[in-house]
Amino acid sequence: MSDENNKGVGTAVQGVGGPRDGRTAPGEQGTTLTTRQGHPVHDNQNSRTVGSRGPMTLENYQFIEKLSHFDRERIPERVVHARGVGAHGVFRATGKVGDEPVSKYTRAKLFQEDGKETPVFVRFSTVGHGTHSPETLRDPRGFAVKFYTEDGNWDLVGNNLKIFFIRDALKFPDLIHSQKPSPTTNIQSQERIFDFFAGSPEATHMITLLYSPWGIPASYRFMQGSGVNTYKWVNDQGEGVLVKYHWEPVQGVRNLTQMQADEVQATNFNHATQDLHDAIERGDFPQWDLFVQIMEDGEHPELDFDPLDDTKIWPREQFPWRHVGQMTLNRNPENVFAETEQAAFGTGVLVDGLDFSDDKMLQGRTFSYSDTQRYRVGPNYLQLPINAPKKHVATNQRDGQMAYRVDTFEGQDQRVNYEPSLLSGPKEAPRRAPEHTPRVEGNLVRAAIERPNPFGQAGMQYRNFADWERDELVSNLSGALAGVDKRIQDKMLEYFTAADADYGQRVREGIQAKEAEMKGQKQEAPVYGTEASSLY
């Protein structure tokens, strides 16, 4: 980092060195290997020992630094969305929402002008499995976008599917525990998964999507994205509307059947990462159009669902998709760890003109996402280049592990690390438009929403599938439920039947056929591989 970049950030890091620093010791080149202390390394092949066969010495600093850092290279992986791939790009606004001026609904600056460009970083991911798990597994896909706007960062953190399993974040730890491998075997268990779903009828819609071909996108380039939750837009008058965000790939949408996924996994379990990386390297830059759905703020009793329910889709015929811009990904990360893995997203990261709704899942995510970044990356994760906004930053937040700089402006009195102050320090920004002030009234309760309707849209989705998609859905669910506890089977069949009678009947028959097939097979444990010869 150059002196110029370090102006006003405190003497502790002014003039800090790095790989691109031109200052070298006598005899060094710009390519000379050094320790982290800047000492030239003259022998990186042999440890310092007493004679060529003797013991190593404790004062072998080069060895100790190298090995101790290696021991600490890994940070805790994300509890969800651990396997991911990232890319840089740009978002171009249209200045409109559909055919209307976007300013009618939001004052967010990144949307206001036709052709206005905002740099972005995107991270795609699987959800339930580990860092190096196959990308062909049946699992929702994460679709997180960090917009580096002139007003600071905006994170739009969503999934490929437009809905979620649950509508209250209180259930989120239990959901994820059920999806993760069993704590006794370290093997993912369909019985555990559906045991949770059997007590969560609101998950029926998401299950219907996940166990269809939409549960395995062919690759990230051919995948939709969605904000999932309900947000708000706020205009210059402080008026708010409810919004849903949708990403539509210009490349089209492609999914895998289970058989196709098995074939891909047999040859390449990094296929989605490789596909995105290679496409960008050859200049075939993937693009997504951003659409929003808009609804007046309110409870909307005329609908058979609550607009704040993230297990529901807003019907397009009532709430049409309106185009607001396009995103192009055009640059791969230089270092996966520094960028893709240390990238930290949060649903609470909004700019002026964008706001929260009372969506329970959104409010829970807003706490959890930023909290897990502080645990995973550290309290100063926002000072990392991939997470830092591309604009002025001045705070009174100080110290903490791995503090890289002090967030002071040039010329600030270093004694003043508080506000208000007459001496120095950052001052509050003037408000340029009225704040959105929705009125909320009611008793504090623990209660589900009044229009849960857990099966209506699941049935509509089942009937809307193409024949081959329905066949795939039934086959996948039958295979997953065959052999699990009959109480769980019965409850899930009750849900599928409530969604659509044909849906429930076909899954029931599929389970029976699968269990009959399993019963007819020998129950011997499989023996893998070919017997080996003796080694020399």
From Swiss-Prot:
Query: How is this protein activated or inhibited?
Result: Strongly inhibited by sodium azide and sodium cyanide, and slightly inhibited by 3-amino-1,2,4-triazole.
Give the matching CDD domains.
catalase_clade_1 (cd08154)
Keyword terms of this UniProt record = Cytoplasm, Heme, Hydrogen peroxide, Iron, Metal-binding, Oxidoreductase, Peroxidase
GO terms for MF: catalase activity; heme binding; metal ion binding
Question: Where in the sequence is the active site?
Answer: 81, 159
Top EC category: oxidoreductase
Gene Ontology biological process terms, A to Z: hydrogen peroxide catabolic process; response to hydrogen peroxide
Q: Per the record, GO CC terms?
A: cytoplasm
The record, for Gene3D superfamilies, names: Catalase core domain
Compartment(s): Cytoplasm
Q: Which InterPro entries match?
A: Catalase, Catalase_clade1/3, Catalase_core, Catalase_haem_BS, Catalase_immune_responsive, Catalase_sf
Temperature note: Optimum temperature is 30 degrees Celsius. Active over a temperature range from 20 to 70 degrees Celsius. Retains 100% of its initial activity following incubation at 40 degrees Celsius, and 82% of its activity following incubation at 50 degrees Celsius. The activity decreases significantly to 30% of the initial activity following incubation at 60 degrees Celsius.
Q: Compositional bias (Polar residues) at which positions?
A: 29-50
Question: Which cofactors are named for this entry?
Answer: heme
Predominant location = cytoplasm
Q: How does it assemble?
A: Homotetramer.
Q: Which family does it belong to?
A: Belongs to the catalase family.
Function according to Swiss-Prot or TrEMBL: Decomposes hydrogen peroxide into water and oxygen; serves to protect cells from the toxic effects of hydrogen peroxide.
Name this polypeptide is given: Catalase
Species of provenance:
Deinococcus radiodurans (strain ATCC 13939 / DSM 20539 / JCM 16871 / CCUG 27074 / LMG 4051 / NBRC 15346 / NCIMB 9279 / VKM B-1422 / R1)
Q: Which gene encodes it?
A: katA
